[in-house]
C-alpha cells in the first residue's frame, strides 16, 4: 500500500505534476523484492498549473472517481486518490472470492445515472458476507466488516480517500504520511 501511495505522490508532486488517471490493480506490478511499482502511463496527463482542472473522461470504470461521471467532468489529482482507495479495497478483500466491483454488470448510462445524477456510489456492506458490494446513498460507505480484519486506521483512511467530494479526500502526500506512521506503529 505504501509503495503505491509513494508512487502516486511522486507523480503528483513533480513540476509539472502528473495525474495517472488509470490507477488500478492491473497497473500495479510487484518486483521480485516485493516492491509495488505503478505502470501504464498511457492515460497519464501532465497538469501544467496547480489551479487548472482537466476536462476529459478517462480511466477504467471500476476505479473511476465520481467526478468523472458528469457530462463535462472537471477533475484534478484527487481522481488518483479515489482510484488508489479502490486498489486498497482490493488488497483488503483479496481473501474473498465473492467480491464484486462497484459497477459490475452496469452499462455506462446506468453508471452515469447512479453516480452523476443520483450521487450514489459503491459501499462495503457489513450486513451480508456473500455480497460485499452494494449501492447506497452518500455520504460515507460502511466498512465495518473490514474493521475485524484490518487496523481501523487503514479502514478510516480508505473511507476518506473514497469521499464523493474530491476536496474531502486527502492528498497522496497525506496518505503517505499516514501509512508511514502506521508502519512505524505496527511493526
Predicted regions and their residues:
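Protein kinase catalytic-loop region centered on the HRD/HxD motif
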Residues: 6-18
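Conserved end of the kinase activation segment
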Residues: 68-78
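Conserved activation segment of eukaryotic-like protein kinases, specifically the C-terminal portion
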Residues: 54-68
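A conserved short helix/loop substructure at the end of the activation segment
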Residues: 163-174
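Catalytic-loop of the protein kinase fold
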Residues: 15-30
Amino acid at each position: 500500500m505504501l509503495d503505491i501511495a509513494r508512487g502516486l505522490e511522486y507523480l503528483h508532486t513533480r513540476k509539472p505534476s502528473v495525474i495517472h488517471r488509470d490507477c488500478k490493480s492491473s497497473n500495479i506490478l510487484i518486483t521480485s523484492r516485493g516492491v509495488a511499482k505503478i505502470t501504464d502511463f498511457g492515460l497519464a496527463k501532465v497538469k501544467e498549473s496547480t489551479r487548472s482542472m482537466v476536462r476529459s473522461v478517462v480511466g477504467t470504470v471500476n476505479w473511476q472517481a465520481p467526478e468523472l461521471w458528469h457530462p463535462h467532468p472537471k477533475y484534478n489529482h484527487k481522481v488518483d486518490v479515489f482510484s488508489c482507495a479502490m486498489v486498497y479495497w482490493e488488497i483488503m478483500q483479496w481473501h474473498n472470492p465473492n467480491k464484486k466491483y462497484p459497477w459490475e454488470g452496469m452499462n455506462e448510462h446506468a453508471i452515469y445515472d447512479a453516480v452523476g445524477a443520483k450521487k450514489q456510489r459503491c459501499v462495503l456492506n457489513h450486513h451480508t458476507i456473500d455480497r460485499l458490494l452494494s449501492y447506497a446513498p452518500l455520504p460515507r460507505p460502511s466498512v465495518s466488516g473490514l474493521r475485524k480484519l484490518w487496523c481501523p486506521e487503514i479502514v478510516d483512511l480508505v473511507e476518506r480517500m473514497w469521499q464523493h467530494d474530491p476536496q474531502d479526500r486527502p492528498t497522496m502526500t497525506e496518505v503517505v504520511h499516514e501509512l508511514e506512521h502506521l508502519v512505524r506503529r505496527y511493526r
